[in-house]
Amino acid sequence: YVQRPGDGLLYQTKDHIRLDFGWEVVAKCFFSYRPEVAVPDIRQIKLQTGDRILLCSDGLYKSMAPDILQARMMDDKPLEEILDVYDFLCKKQGDDNYTAILIECF
């Protein structure tokens, strides 16, 4: 996720997962035995002061509604406090492991 104060969500990556017989299967990854599918998705975004970038696993974004995740991301709080809220929500509502890195541009 890339968000800008006042503008909201600028960019969100697409998850390369598909369902196969009820199981989630990675449909695309960088490390592959088939080089033709190992093409990275690259987007260029001009970042500004105050922009925030959230790198996270599916364990985080599947543990809460997208509007809650995005709203908390732009809270006027220190990044550690926002990550603590994510941690609380994942422990309360999630059933998977989770990882999150939240970055603020200066």
Kindly give the residue locations of the regions a language model identified.
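C-terminal catalytic subdomain
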Residues: 31, 35-56, 60-106
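Short acidic-glycine loop/turn motifs at beta-strand connectors
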Residues: 3-8, 105-106
